[in-house]
Amino acid sequence: MSSHDDDHTPLLISDPSVNKPFRSRTPSPEREYCSDCPLQAKGSACNGNSHSLKHETNGASSSNNNVAKSSSHDSFKAKPKNYDSTSNSNEPISFNEPDSSNSHHNNESICNNDNCCREIARRRSLSPLLILPLNFINAFSWGMIEIPLLFLLRQELCAIHYNLDPTQLSPDDPICRLAEITTGVSKVRAAFGSLAAFLGLFSTAYYGTMGDIYGRRLVLFITVSFLLLGDLWLLYQSYAPKHPYFVLFAAALKGLGGYISTVVASQNSFVADCSKTEFRAWYLGLNFAAYHLGTALGPSLSGFIVQYTPHMYYVFYITSTFWIIYLLYVWLILPESLDVSESKEQQNKISGFSSIWRSCLEPLIILWPRSLCTEESCEFHQYDINADTHAGRRHWDVLLAAILISLTLLGAGSMGLLPLYTDYKFGWGPMKASLILSTDSFASSITLVALFPLLSKVIEKIIEKLYSSEGLFEDPSRADNTSSLQGIRNVFSYLVRPGYSRSSILRGRTADEKYTIVKRDVWNAQLGYAIALSAAVLLAVAKSDVALFTAVIIQAISNMVVPCVQSIALNGVQSEYNGRVLAAFAVFEAVALIIRGPIYAFVYTESMKVSYPNMIFFLSAVIYGCCFIIIFFMRLYRPLNRKR
């Protein structure tokens, strides 16, 4: 391979449409690549010029742009290059034989001229903010049913305890404030969440793969239809309260719709499809901010209805209406973020699973780091810059991120019992219990919209100062962040800026930029877990209303960890795997939701026997401590320098 050829050969990354994928390589400032169009070089589709990189099968070169001059067969069998971490040259190495290499370049199905990049440009120009109204509606509807569901169960169990008709009791009747009734409510509520999450575990993975093939809109429409049916059943139950276990049918309907995880994962996939790499964490943060805003307003309204109106079923009328609005928005307004014109082979993959169990486990394959290297080719479905060696080192960030997200949900299980805890220990009613949940969600929204981007910008500046002596940040593409006030401006610009501006569509990511993004998110996550641990301890020792509200506000600041961890993981995979990664995360979330209800119900019941109901918060503190330790094992995307 000639030196001239080395200087201009495009950097290639593995792609599912390529039979023998190339090695992922460190991009250099002179040769940036289109990560979504692996066979397009800088100066071609990335810059608007539609010339393809084709090698003629007879060994001669037909490119008049000096893109790829073919060399003889003997040059491919030259002495292998030596890799060394002290050299600054960035020469790409192909492990493919000439014939197979030519076949890759001649495969027009991979990227027919600039058609591939044109499609990526189209969906990157979609604004991730289009999903925010749906995220709000989803969270608002889920938030509204939490307080009514708890007090509906409390009313029905209290009627059984006193052998009364449920209609003779008000939802917040003081005679129902007994330890055995409170623990009974926690058990039924745990069964509700576990059943829905268990069914969601099997449906979420299937919906995730379906979303990558048929598009996000179809998945959202199907899943929300099941959620609507679940709320209609709760509406019937609130009209005529029966046995508390009748509400489990609503849990089954919601589970068939993927429960909470599928809708959230599909919404996050839309954000990942349409957002640029360096803005992805902030857009995911805005997504979570909209979610927390909905969970803030929902409990407040439902708590007011339960406490000050005689009819609890008003709540479920409202939630059913909002789900209908959600469906209309998806049908009439939301654009599709993916090109759904996939091959029949891929479409058969989603319909030809031998079992539901296999469909559940299929997306989890993306979490396992795979590196298969031979003398001819290397295949990476996950990649990092460190892994560009003959040996091919695995990187575990995606799997660790899935574990962290599931543990974070598990640690948050104590917040679900907070209304029961405050009702029993402090004598709060539905309205006050809903206010503390709303406070948590409002504080989370402010954190993710304002505090998180500013903190990220400060940490990014610190990283630049600490590591500038190593030359990691001397890249011209970073010149757009010259002012220290840019972080403040970004708070507002993130609200209106689309995921990709036309001027920067498909600009390649350099090693310096990726290193900065990942290390910044790692530091944010470490800080968030430390705050979560402290807040859980404060909740456990709180003796007054003021102390409880203060601890909840501090705990809300830690909610930035989820978008940070997701951003770390998504920066470690190719963009075409975003949907599968988030679907795999949703499976882990479903597992956490399955087990956290019974775990916290058991701990709460046992601690009530010894008059220590605050043990649930100490359990959360232990879980957050484990997360704080795990985050230190996540690897960074450091540049790998080579010499010939």
UniProtKB/Swiss-Prot annotation:
**Protein name (database record):** Uncharacterized membrane protein C14C4.07
A biological-process GO annotation: transmembrane transport
**Which cysteines in this chain are paired by disulphide bridges?**
none
What GO cellular component term, any one, is given? fungal-type vacuole membrane
> What organism does the UniProt record list as the source?
Schizosaccharomyces pombe (strain 972 / ATCC 24843) (Fission yeast)
Q: Where is this region: Disordered?
A: 1-35, 48-106
Modified positions (Phosphoserine) are S28
Where are its TM segments located? 131-151, 190-210, 218-238, 245-265, 286-306, 314-334, 398-418, 435-455, 522-542, 546-566, 583-603, 614-634
